[in-house]
Amino acid sequence: MRTFVTGGSGYLGRNLLSALVARGISVRALVRSEEAAQKVQALGAQPILGTLEHRETLKEGMAGCDVLFHAAALTSARATDAEFHRANVLGTETVLAAARDARIQRMVHVSTEAVLADGRPLLQVDESHPLPKRPFAGYPATKAQAEQLVLQANGPGFTTVVVRPRFIWGADDTAFLPQLIDAIRTKRFRWVDGGRYLTSTCHVANVCEGMLLAAERGPGGEVYFLTDGAPVELRSFLTLLLETQGIKAEVGNIPFQAARAAAHLGESLWRALVPQARAPALRLAVYLLGREVTLNDDKARRELGYAGRVTHQQGLDALRQAGPAGQGAMPHRA
């Protein structure tokens, strides 16, 4: 198998590159800078310098490859709707066009459970749960659009599969955990409703397992949730994550309704005071971390043979041994 990976210098991408190389699989990875090129080269992948906007560069990089893993996305809380659209929708369109040009046979697209976010709890939902008619934030809206583009592209000679992991975590995290630690240290973090509700999670190694299985045996035009298995209480899990870094989660509490109102007010004030910049997506953060979000991944286990082999305890032990999180952090757009 010869593979091409977008987002290879991001947190998930780096782990995917390592997993592919460990299996003796040839890997090329799209990177946007020389620094990122050095990182992916150190992992054993061949860097391809370019962006999601350059169809010819993508086509040349994919030439001779069998499988495409599309993990690149813009996730920044302060990106504009136009920036989200350019990266997540137009970027995916360009990747699909280049894949067809290069005659890629199979594509695995990394999406997110956030495409379902509508402000209400998500309780053990499966892949049949409908997308909301009116997404309320640029990130989930454009990720949902990208999903649909990928699924519509499925056909003879080009098999496309979508995976939706929830709450990716693990050692070498340069995304969520460093941000959580910063919020704790700067006293910007509060438990919403005490954090006493359930969440699904997915260790980064388990995400990679699911992606590889989707590439090997996933039927075209399908979507798969990926999780660690049984959901956990959010407060307990975040407390354990922080303890691996020697940090105690001694923070206050805020009711959900107050958190939602504060987020709405914060976004409104930002738009009024800093109209030239996009307000941070505070409401989305409250909805994704302040409500129960639990997913049913039976479909992936049944159809792909997915097992989610890394347990919470194994992942926490590895985090503890790895030392401080966030070293060598990369930008939000991988």
UniProtKB/Swiss-Prot annotation:
Effect of residue 139 to F: Does not produce aurachin B
Listed EC numbers: 1.1.1.394
Biological process annotations from GO: steroid biosynthetic process
Gene3D superfamilies listed in its UniProt record: NAD(P)-binding Rossmann-like Domain
Disruption phenotype: Mutant accumulates aurachin D and aurachin C and does not produce aurachin B and aurachin A.
Single GO cellular component term: cytoplasm
Keywords for the protein's UniProt record, in alphabetical order: NAD, Oxidoreductase
GO molecular function, one term: oxidoreductase activity, acting on the CH-OH group of donors, NAD or NADP as acceptor
Residues forming the catalytic site: 139
Reaction(s) the record says it catalyses: aurachin B + NAD(+) + H2O = 4-hydroxy-2-methyl-3-oxo-4-[(2E,6E)-farnesyl]-3,4-dihydroquinoline 1-oxide + NADH; 3,4-dihydroxy-2-methyl-4-[(2E,6E)-farnesyl]-3,4-dihydroquinoline 1-oxide + NAD(+) = 4-hydroxy-2-methyl-3-oxo-4-[(2E,6E)-farnesyl]-3,4-dihydroquinoline 1-oxide + NADH + H(+)
Family of the protein in this entry: Belongs to the 3-beta-HSD family.
Primary role: Ketoreductase that catalyzes the final step in the conversion of aurachin C to aurachin B. Catalyzes the reduction of 4-hydroxy-2-methyl-3-oxo-4-[(2E,6E)-farnesyl]-3,4-dihydroquinoline-1-oxide to form 3,4-dihydroxy-2-methyl-4-[(2E,6E)-farnesyl]-3,4-dihydroquinoline 1-oxide, which then undergoes a spontaneous dehydration to form aurachin B. Accepts both NADH and NADPH, but has a preference for NADH.
Name of the featured protein: 4-hydroxy-2-methyl-3-oxo-4-farnesyl-3,4-dihydroquinoline-1-oxide ketoreductase
Gene name of the encoded protein: auaH
